[in-house]
């Protein structure tokens, strides 16, 4: 056996137990062999640890590791031999919560016992006995195994002589430590008369390495020889396996051929006999039913005659009657299958003809001239078609009508565009071929008239669709009402017939009468039940021709169902409606109710179609940005026209469509974006070219501000004559206050009013306009801060320096905008819905930002004077003459500051600014006096300082508007302690 040639060094001993083997510990059979002395002394400077503990494939294979069970914590804790004294292993340290818990076995695994192996033991025991007997008969194999074990032990002992460093996986002589360990050249020193000993050591080292090489080569050759027999055995087994497969394939092929012959001889003949017998039986049945076939033979020609006169309902009734006879009297006859399928195909053909007829009617109704005043085209034809389709349960005719609506809506727009383009002389249709390109060449008034015409045609189109769908809806409701009445009559009839014990026969006769011919529905209304039975038997004959539908006008039509319909039907031809309703429609109340809902949804869909086509028309015109380039008045006119059309369609169809409204909102957003970007760009250009000098105020801007004071936020109309005579003013007067401003701020106020007026004209963009206006005001604040406080104007417009006058003028402009922010907020608040009042917080943030900017400008003015005081007073000396040159310069600079800002800032702000400047002055003077050790002692120095301070105070209070300013100069002296 192949297993006998295994290279395992562990022999398998037999045991009395058949299924378990005892593994022999190889360590008990290994005879220790002394190894050769190591002639590679270790360098004291090398890594001795790495040399001594290097792994060995031979000696390390029996070493204990952390994976053994005795040092594995889970194995130790799960040891079944756990002593009772060890049960408190965890609880004695960590508490009673840590206790041994029994692991519940998985309920997915079955409980295995020895009984499960009983059958296997019985089957394998005989084989095991034979195997043991064969092992005893072949003792040389055991000898071979012992020899193999002895050889393996000897090989392992030889390999132990090779140092572990040669077994390391990272062994490389280019490593200095490894090289010195293998070839210790430090011991081979020829100096000092030791040459002979070193030569002997070198020779011994060479012999030792050669010995190691021989050991390794011998072991490699031995391993190859051990596995050669297994390799040749595997190849032999492969050839045998291929032979077995080839023989098996031939056997399978032969077996299949035999089975095919058996099937042909024993099965096919019997089956053929059975088929012949079945055919004979069918022929007998056909012969017995030939006369019955003649009774229905005339059905198809009669149907063809009815179809030639478009009597779809009569043809369907005849087909239904014939199928009913086949199912009741000729049921189970296989030879009549072709007749049923032909009738079904004929019925399907009638269905297709009715659908085609309805499609033709829909096309004619929807595409007739819109100037025609007739709401419904051929109402009788429509009612007849709808009843026929309902009878056949072809409820998808509404989808056909919907498709025709889509096509008609496209044609309406196309025809309107063609008519408008043909009326426009500026468009050369020979040069511009595409209709869409021709439409884009229309200017706004022409395009607006075209859109108005399209909306008008769509309104008429929806009115016609609504009238047609109302007729269909009334037919569906009449059928639903008829079903309910029929159900009530059936219940009453069943109660009466139950008393006579012939309810079943009467009901069958009634059903046959109701479903045979058209004339039975209205010409035999007053017949007694006996007459009904007679009529039903007469109609069962195929030779009876169906009565013409002209009998509608007969006065004998007085059945219960028809008379009730005469009072409920809203059709212009009540008789025609009654004929259809009296038929069995085979529709449940839920289906009819769903169909009625679908009709209403189709009306909604018609509105959506018109809106969708209008949206596509708008989008095709908006491709080149035409709608975004409209001015405010043009866009307002367009939006009002679209809103009117939306309201008209909602009134006609009963539901508001959102597509056109969404397109209007989308265009409004684009309009707002363009509106905002244009004005923001304009403001940016104005700021970049602003030199921050006081500008004259034209009269029209003063009128604009005056109108705001009156509570009217709107751009006033220009008065050409009066404007030319009035001269510009130096300042802008707002509610009695004078504002010296730059030209950019005047235009900014006008831009703000344009935003407010746009909100009045287009209320739907109020929130967007509020956001854009907030962005514009923030942009003005930040950009003006960059240009003035950040000195950006020096590079942008080439100013030499940012003067105090520039700063004061910027502050006054910001104050003017802050003055109007509450007015703007109130304007937007009146037009915002209450849910969006939170957006007004933007104005609060803007007001805070503007106030912070104004405060920064004031702080900048104070900082300018503060640096001046620090520069002048640091050189101040208390000596004659009085007033000193330092105080003269200070007063001169204060006068310049006052002259620069007094005409720009209000008097109250000027006073507050100079109070802050004076506080800075006192702080620096106090610091300098403390440095000079000048105190308020009434001495000569104190007198000189007092004279200078008096000069400063007099000059400061002499300035305009600062006479009553409380300077409190006593704070310059240190307080006595």
Swiss-Prot record:
Name the gene: VPS54
**What name does this protein carry?**
Vacuolar protein sorting-associated protein 54
Listed under GO biological process in this entry are: apoptotic DNA fragmentation; astrocyte differentiation; cellular response to progesterone stimulus; gene expression; Golgi to vacuole transport; homeostasis of number of cells within a tissue; in utero embryonic development; intracellular calcium ion homeostasis
Where on the tree of life does the source sit, at the highest rank? Answer: Eukaryota
Q: Which residues form a coiled coil?
A: 240-260, 480-507, 582-603
Establish whether keyword Membrane is in the entry: yes
- Segment Disordered: which positions? 535-575
Point to the regions of Polar residues compositional bias.
535-552
Q: Could you describe the subunit structure of this protein?
A: Component of the Golgi-associated retrograde protein (GARP) complex, also called VFT (VPS fifty-three) complex, composed of VPS51, VPS52, VPS53 and VPS54. EIPR1 interacts with GARP complex and mediates its recruitment to the trans-Golgi network. Interacts with VPS51 in an EIPR1-independent manner.
